[in-house]
């Protein structure tokens, strides 16, 4: 557990300061949440460190989507228990906190299974983190998972400009949380709550602050991001499409993305944004989970497979260069060979640039956990292997199709060798450019010459 994967840069050494190590598991929103928790702690005098070995506070921001994520948490807590015992033997302290969706789902159970934990705090209450830590210092074991009545975003401090600059030229911005879809396999409605949209005023203010700190690309986040809605500047009710047009007017913001979407919430205004908004990148993550109508109904997805395919056709009609990403679950209870073949057919019909696929694992508290007719693990394994082979074939074909193409690339960081830069293509793929004297944050025109492992190799054009 030596990696800090939250994009929190360690701060220069200062004597007698409290240090925090944040470990993030799971989705992009957890990365965003970790950054905001770090901002709260910075306001209390904590500085980030890139190792738990010298941290005064270790905070694990957790994911509950799959069973393995919970197992990772308890394995990490076992290692931290030994570290905490060693500290106490030398008269020193280590505070251990668990945040995120496992914290929300399990609460007091975490303290029972891991008594070395001092603090459990959910994703809707992390604005109370400084107060919770004060209670821990007074000797209390704290579980803070009740859904807050107040808007947490109104109570979170903004990071200092130099801290935002250290995080890079691409940034996440949460605009929506929670989900009301209640897919039978999913824990999100139970760990993140009902759908809540942040106000246009809040979102624009945060986006302007990020742009002022040098951010060029914004990715809007939500568990069901295209369900976002709110009162617009013009007095009308806006959807995500209108919000994207508003954010595109902010000076300095050159690129926009959003994730994760639900097919039922892809409305006309959002499709129009893909057609008309040059800042909106031609990349869409739109999960379908299965190509079988019978399984989609059992999952409570509220759409059919052919409706999903027709939706993709509509978007590609207005944005022919769109690259599509998706999510798939194999082995959902009752999935037959024919159901799986329907999924394979949908994948062939849609042709994905990238996709994520998993074996179904029942999550406690979800309707899917109570279903009978579970698929044997060996069958799940075989289906997953076949699906991933097809998706990999499509992914490599998409990357190969980039060879010879010209495109604009946003430079994000120096490469591993002198003179090399790493950027991001409009289709989200990393692009490696040799012999570049450009700066991070520049957008340069390149020609793709070859492909690497999940990356593109390019030559800068004059």
From Swiss-Prot:
List positions binding [4Fe-4S] cluster 2. Answer: 179, 183, 186
Residues noted as binding [4Fe-4S] cluster 1 in the record, renumbered to the chain: 27, 63, 101
Subcellular localization(s) per the UniProt record = Cytoplasm
User: What reaction is this protein's catalytic activity?
Assistant: N(6)-dimethylallyladenosine(37) in tRNA + (sulfur carrier)-SH + AH2 + 2 S-adenosyl-L-methionine = 2-methylsulfanyl-N(6)-dimethylallyladenosine(37) in tRNA + (sulfur carrier)-H + 5'-deoxyadenosine + L-methionine + A + S-adenosyl-L-homocysteine + 2 H(+)
Q: What is the originating organism of this protein?
A: Brucella anthropi (strain ATCC 49188 / DSM 6882 / CCUG 24695 / JCM 21032 / LMG 3331 / NBRC 15819 / NCTC 12168 / Alc 37)
User: Ranges for the Radical SAM core domain?
Assistant: 165-397
- Residue span(s) of domain MTTase N-terminal: 18-138
| Entry function | Catalyzes the methylthiolation of N6-(dimethylallyl)adenosine (i(6)A), leading to the formation of 2-methylthio-N6-(dimethylallyl)adenosine (ms(2)i(6)A) at position 37 in tRNAs that read codons beginning with uridine.
What cofactors are annotated for this protein?
[4Fe-4S] cluster
Keywords noted in UniProt: 4Fe-4S, Cytoplasm, Iron, Iron-sulfur, Metal-binding, S-adenosyl-L-methionine, Transferase, tRNA processing
Give the protein's recorded name.
tRNA-2-methylthio-N(6)-dimethylallyladenosine synthase
Assembly mode: Monomer.
Coiled coil ranges (UniProt) are none
